[in-house]
Amino acid sequence: MTQLSVQERFSSVRARLEALGLWDADALVRIAPGAVFRAGGEPVETDLFSAVSAPMAVLTAGRYAREFLRKPHALRAETDDAAQMFGVRVPVRTSPRRGDTACIVPDRGFVVTARFENELIAACILLEKLCMTACLSHRIGAPKALSAPLCLMEHAVYRKKYSRPSLAAARGEESAPETREVPDLALRESVIAYGKKLAENRLIQATWGNVSARIDENRFLITPSGVDYDRIRPEDIVEIRISDGSFAAGQRPSSERELHRLVYAQRGDIRAVIHTHSAALQTFAACRESLRTPEIDAPCASYGVSVSKKLAESASGVLRSHDLCIMANHGFIAVGADLETALVRAVTAENAAKRLLEAE
């Protein structure tokens, strides 16, 4: 694994946040303890991150964060991905305290802390989504915050389990991957390609979201759990039996595999399932509101704890008669006769949700 200089790592963070519209002219980035840079790349000494225990941190603000800062307040976790990253809430502080994963700094922006770069970028995206919901949700309803015990549980699971593969990769601790021949190679490569397209279309962040494709009436392929989409190999894609959800020992399929299995079991016409965590649709999910326009019919399924049987049954129940489903406090799912159809439906729904939320 090539070791990048702190300046190269800063440039990578800046380029990625700029591409997402999450870079601010007054941004500060800590690449490592003692290595802090201004937005222009100049090293700077600051006490802002002095209490931060994580190696990386950034002070920045996107469009909705800047709007939110006019009247800042603590942000409660209203979706599972926010709870996993931040816990119960994102507090308002003049500077982050030890143990904070994020905080709102009045008149300056938000601070997020992270153990590795992909986590830093994902946290920035998630916090901007929380700010978007805070700014626009009044147009469709009121967000329903998740309970504190549930948020704490989800945060612990993310830190101790779900993020471990990405953390190991960032630290260079992965063992050399085993290269082996796998069946259905073309379909596996398509699943990987469409996972990357989800990221390119800003429908997911980091390892959240998943993609699957039917092989035949008995089997389907699905993305693995906790692996960044740019690192997934064909042999990482997991084959699952539709009848009972079984898969080969030693593999780690997506934690949402039961939802995909139920969809394939009940609808023979479906050959692809895409699960996203995109910004505008997350606002609908946080408010537990359906999205209905002349072009979109996406009912909201009742809430079920992340990866639970209730979540899978609730969402798959909606998908018996619909091709789109908003998952309360969780995300969105689109199905189709092929991966391209499912992706187009997900992009179209996100754009429709954004137009509705941003309409004057």
Regions found by a protein language model. Give the residues of each.
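Glycine-rich flexible loops
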Residues: M1-E360
